[in-house]
């Protein structure tokens, strides 16, 4: 474990919980070294009682030139992702804090630069999702099954309306990992609620608390834009009944807390914000948008 006492505060801390995922974590760390190694970024890995070679990997990485300047890690014992994320938030030095996962690979330099600039330029944005946002709607049907949580009348995924979603951020109700939040927000509204351990709906609850405190929640499809790659996006398998039961419990807890707010605010107008793109960001966006044209034409014909 590495102390941060001699380091300047980071502009962004990426908090990465990990458990027995040595090879993939190594690629994640290498991606941050490659594309953000010269930036004022802190990587904080929370090692959750790993029994593979993760500890040795972290010790080796933290003693490299880049690691001494940018990498810290802390140990926990089978605490689960939510508690590990909170512990990382407590230890983070960054003005901005990212909830990252150990199978997400940074793929460019412009993404971190743009994320920092988003929060500099758009002071009303408190939390930014980097994949997809979620909008929620009031319906009277009870939540009895896991599938009820995903009813399209109740929950809709979005990256904003086409074609403007290539060049702007879209206000949403909530989002999914990865996301970036202002430290100021966490200090005001608190960390992830550990009532949601072990999994899911914790970040939705946080998003609604951020909104209740006066900030907005935004999203942009940065994975689609090539800013990062999430291995889990392509390897999701069949969910077990026990997993669905845990998610159902958490989803019910969320809706018990926030359904009145959903009913009150779902019809509000949604803000948008221009992406503060670098030249590289503009060029990459143009390339990705052109690549998407054939698929878009097929969808419209269908």
PLM-predicted stretches and their roles:
Residues 30-40:
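Short, acidic, metal-binding catalytic loop of nucleotide-sugar glycosyltransferases
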Residues 47-56, 105:
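A conserved acidic beta->alpha catalytic loop
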Residues 76-92:
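Glycine-rich, basic loop-to-helix element that forms the pyrophosphate-binding segment
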Residues 82-83, 159-184:
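A recurrent flexible, glycine/aromatic-enriched loop bordering the glycosyltransferase active site
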Residues 94-105:
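Short beta-strand-to-loop acidic/aromatic patch adjacent to the donor-nucleotide binding site
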Residues 108-149:
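Conserved donor NDP-sugar-binding/catalytic core segment of glycosyltransferases
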Residues 112-114, 173-179, 184-190, 196-224:
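A short, conserved alpha-helix in the catalytic core of glycosyltransferases
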Residues 133-135, 197, 219-241:
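Active-site donor/metal-binding and catalytic loop motifs
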């Amino acid at each position: 474990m590495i102390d941060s006492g001699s380091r300047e505060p980071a502009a962004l801390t990426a908090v990465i919980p990990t458990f027995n995922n040595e090879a993939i974590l190594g690629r994640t760390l290498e991606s941050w070294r490659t594309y953000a190694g010269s930036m004022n970024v802190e990587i904080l890995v929370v090692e959750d009682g790993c029994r593979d070679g993760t500890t040795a990997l972290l010790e080796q990485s933290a003693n490299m030139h880049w690691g001494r300047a940018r990498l810290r890690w802390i140990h926990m014992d089978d605490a689960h992702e939510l508690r590990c994320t909170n512990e990382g938030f407590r230890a983070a030095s960054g003005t901005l804090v990212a909830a990252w996962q150990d199978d997400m690979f940074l793929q460019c330099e412009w993404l971190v630069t743009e994320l920092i600039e988003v929060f500099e330029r758009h002071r009303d944005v408190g939390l930014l999702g980097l994949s997809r946002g979620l909008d929620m709607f009031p319906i009277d049907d009870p939540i009895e099954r896991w599938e009820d949580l995903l009813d399209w009348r109740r929950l809709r995924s979005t990256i904003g309306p086409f074609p403007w979603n290539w060049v702007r951020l879209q206000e949403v109700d909530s989002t999914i990992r990865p996301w970036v939040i202002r430290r100021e927000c966490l200090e005001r509204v608190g960390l992830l609620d550990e009532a949601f351990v072990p999994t899911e709906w914790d970040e939705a609850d946080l998003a609604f608390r951020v909104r209740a405190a006066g900030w907005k929640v935004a999203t942009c499809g940065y994975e689609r834009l090539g800013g990062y790659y999430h291995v889990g996006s392509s390897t999701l398998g069949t969910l077990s009944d026990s997993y669905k039961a845990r998610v159902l419990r958490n989803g019910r807890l969320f809706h018990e807390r926030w359904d009145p707010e959903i009913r009150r605010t779902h019809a509000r107008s949604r803000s948008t914000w221009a992406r503060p793109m670098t030249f590289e960001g503009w060029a990459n966006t143009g390339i990705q948008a052109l690549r998407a044209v054939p698929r878009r034409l097929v969808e419209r014909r269908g």
